[in-house]
Amino acid sequence: MFPNPRFRPAPRTVLVGLAIAFALLALRLPAATAVTSPKDQFGFAIGDDYQLVNYKQLVAYWKKLDAESDRMSLVEIGKTAEGRTMVMAIITSPANHARLGRYKDVARRLALAEGLSDAGARKLAAEGKAVVWIDGGLHATEILGSQQLIELVWRMTSGADAETLRILDDVILLAVPANPDGLDLVADWYLREKEPSKRSMSGVPVLYQKYIGHDNNRDFYMNTQPETKAMSRQLYIEWHPQILYNHHQTGPAGTVLFAPPFRDPFNYVFDPLIPVGLDLVSASMHNRFVTEGKPGATMRSGAGYSTWWNGGLRSAGYFHNIIGILTEAIGNPTPVDIPFIPDRLLPKQDYPYPVAPQKWHFRQSIEYAITADMAILDVASKHREDFLYRRFLMGKHAIELGSKDSWTIVPGTIAEVKAAVEKDRKAEGAPAQGAGPGGRGGFGRGGVDKKYYEAIFDKATRDPRGYIIPADQADFPTATKLVNVLIESGVAVERATAGFDVAGKSYPKGSFVVKAAQAFRPHVMTMFEPQDHPNDFPYPGGPPNPPYDAAGWTLAYQMGVAFDRILDGFSGPFEKVPGVTKPPAGRFEAGPGAAGYFLDHRVNDTFIAVNRLLKAGEKAFWLKSGFEADGKTHPAGTIWVPASPGAAAILQKAAKDLGLNVIGAAGAPKGEAFVPRPLRVGLWDTYGGSMASGWIRWLLEQFEFPYELVFAPALDAGGLAEKFDVLIFVGGSIPRVQVAGQEAAGMRGFQQTPPANVPEEFKNRIGRITAEKTIPLLRQFVEAGGTILALDSATVLAEHFGLPLANALVEMAQDGTEAPLRPEKFYVPGSIMRARVNPAHPLAQGLAETIDVFFDNTPAWTLPPDAELKGVNPVVWFDDGKLLRSGWAWGESYLRRSVQVAEAAVGKGKIFLYGPEIAFRGQPHGTFKLLFNGIYYGPAKTIILE
């Protein structure tokens, strides 16, 4: 009856013993908690076709689970941009909840690795619990993430199976709905149709994050948005998870999802335990998919995701020693089809278990997401102690590297070695590299002389032990903003309590110090050091493999902050900055008889003070020439504010709150001055929202510029000069000089939603700028005295207006026509470049003669010799020599001597053309002045101060 001995029944005595043992064990295990299921709460199961739960419903449900389950605690972690409360569910066993504060402290101590011996770390790792962060819904239209989180929390609060109970005992789960505003917006939009079959996520009328939409996953080192700040605080200051899992959509065509491991390159600054830890966690996911009979998971070459870039929710974790997991899965409450793609049916290393083409329902995607969640929780449970200890090791390694001479080997290092070898070979008359037999590059199995290896470790090229941000730089308030960005990401920053000397240089009290000897050293390095992205091509002469996001982003460069790299260990009168800080109060140097006050144009926050003055009806003048008063020289661009009680009150507050120095003068300056005045600023936007416009919107609000949004129908109505002084157009707003029938950019969302289906409040946003109707009206606006600021691809207005600029990034095709340079010849993805400036030009006043600009395959021009005679003046340009500062520039020679920012006179008005990303994601504070100056200089009148 039982031919297979594996299935033979156990003896009766053994069964009785096991029954007693299980009974005793049951007394010690938490009972299955009686909690409300999603179906009982909402009337449908999570993943049912045509059904969604919005954020308001999610919070109400989680509050109920919090009351019903002793496994869950619901906490508030911040507010959203629209004012909703962000929540986080903390799920673990009741016994762990009783010691939650202790386990949180254990995770923090291991993550920071400060003053902790190896034995002490092992003891804490044995005591602690693995902390796993799982979020959902960051990109709200990728609706699977938020919905699966509801299912996961219910299963973890109700499950009584052995695996769930083990996980609850070993792991603390942090479950976070990452975009509450977006979830309410998208779910409500989808459900607005009474007829389920008509429901669609297409055509959402606004961005699903108030300002930046999809870019909310590009904000995790800058922390500009309240949601990002809240999550960064939990990740890097409060909880320090060892693993974070960031759900996204959608999967590559013909698959169900992409899951790690990722393709190369990974970043050279983070710990090797990051990529191998990723492999460990990823293997558990793929193993579970296959074991559960869930085909369709691809990895590595299956999609373009990598671990190079810092700035996403998942990717910023790597630079904080967290294993960050991303999945991109298919699925929609409206059923979809997995298409038949023949090549996808063939198994391979990166796609071992193909999925058949089929109709796909949302519930299937929910189950896949839960499988991925459980795989991560399971591996965290089984390797609990290892994950905790490895987090300590990564922090310890970072501290050690920052405490001694160390070198980060990057592609440029290897290129220098190869160049040295090649040079010596040529001098010796040896064959050129690659000509010899065996090995790569002709080096053979024996490699090359070790002297080349030893040359890598030149003392002058070592990594810094730390960075000093001097307090006496012109725009110290912006430097303080950089420091706050670091602090919000968990970086330890110190401040000098007295003046001090390091490496032969004196620094004043109040200077900031960032030591490299800290656990988050990888993050520190990417904020101050240039990125050196490899030349990434599939084969010699082939097109470049695009990086997942930016290739270079060094934040200190982007923000224009002065800092010194300190190569040797140093100390001084330093104290830790305990949290986000303000710049020291500025000086208000004005006696009762002062005629007025000078403000420094080099300081970005001066624009806040000017905007407050103008809003209050006070006057301000922008001096066209330098001026000497009371023994002090004030450069061209200085702001002069005539004395009045109102102006004094505003400027005293600005000095205190913003750190501005307000310098009084006994007499008023003389000479020419621009007169900034309250302006009517229109910022282009479109139905569905523009992220580029949203970033400008956010930026204008931070610096207190007045503005209103303007949509295509309002532009087409004409009469623009009566409504606006300044119009701002961002990338995606202006159509190319058209080939007939070619669609303009900027219409995301509308195509799938007929006008009859658009709510009345949004109908005035429908439409697009056209060459036939809108462009002539824009020209009339400028000719009548208006000002246009055109950013990125909107600079094609120059071509529409017939201005004498030519595209610098073209070559002659064989048929004699111009064609854009192919990426095999020229390719500069998101990188920082060094540019020259004419600081005497009003558009550039307050800037130095050289600046760093963010360039992302953006426009560049050449000017004919008579351009200035025709009213076109260069303001910022690329010089000869090396341009790349951080990132990847293939064929950068094509950019040399090209114009990056220009002013053009058109009739009585002006158009300013900005090729680089001068406001990119709220990061390049060093180029904000180009935008702000344009807003005030464009329509300003010139007067003579006497």
Regions picked out by a protein language model, each given a short descriptive name:
Residues M1-P11:
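N-terminal secretory signal peptides that target proteins for export/translocation
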